[in-house]
């Protein structure tokens, strides 16, 4: 897997060894993974300006792109699901949140805990959303609060990916 140091800054991994990075993912510079987190195929995490932190039991799915600008670090909370082809740029995502496939979050955006950003949503610069929000559209807006059932669904998604990366860590073998 391509893991690069840049200007003396290298990605950091949990001491307990409980994480997984797909061999086609790219991690550069200031990237910090927490325990039970995973980075999937084709994802790029480019910590060349500020830190990118991936919280415990969170996953970055296939072909997601994460980048920062000076003054805009990125923190992804615990138990988060970052969907396929999501683009995150210098934003903050609260615990137990799901960012749907193809969503874009720009510098300074803040997503509260237990929130769901719909597929294809565009969260503009410095836009902030409260906890328990269902966020959709372009530009993104809150359409309602998340109920306990939806919050449990997000948590279940994080659980599935913890089991999945453990399966891949043990059983994935290159055959060609």
Regions found by a protein language model. Give the residues of each.
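C-terminal segments of enzyme domains that contribute to small-molecule binding surfaces
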Residues: 2-15, 74, 78-82, 86-87, ...
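Left-handed beta-helix
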Residues: 17, 22-23, 28-29, 34-35, ...
């Amino acid at each position: 897997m391509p893991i690069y140091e840049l200007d003396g800054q290298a990605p950091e991994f949990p001491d307990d060894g409980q994480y997984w990075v797909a061999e086609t993912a790219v991690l550069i510079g200031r990237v910090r993974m927490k325990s039970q987190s995973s980075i999937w195929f084709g994802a790029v995490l480019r910590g060349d300006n500020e830190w990118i932190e991936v919280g415990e039991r969170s996953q970055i799915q296939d072909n997601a792109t994460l980048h920062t600008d000076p003054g805009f670090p990125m923190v992804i909370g615990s138990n988060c699901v970052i969907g396929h082809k999501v683009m995150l740029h210098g934003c903050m995502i609260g615990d137990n949140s799901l960012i749907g496939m193809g969503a874009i979050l720009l510098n300074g955006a803040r997503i509260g805990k237990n929130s769901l950003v719909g597929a294809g949503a565009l969260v503009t610069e410095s836009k902030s959303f409260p906890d328990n929000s269902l966020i959709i559209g372009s530009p993104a807006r809150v359409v309602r609060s998340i109920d306990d059932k939806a919050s449990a669904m997000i948590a279940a998604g994080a659980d599935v990916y913890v089991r999945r990366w453990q399966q891949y860590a043990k059983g994935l073998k290159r055959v060609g």
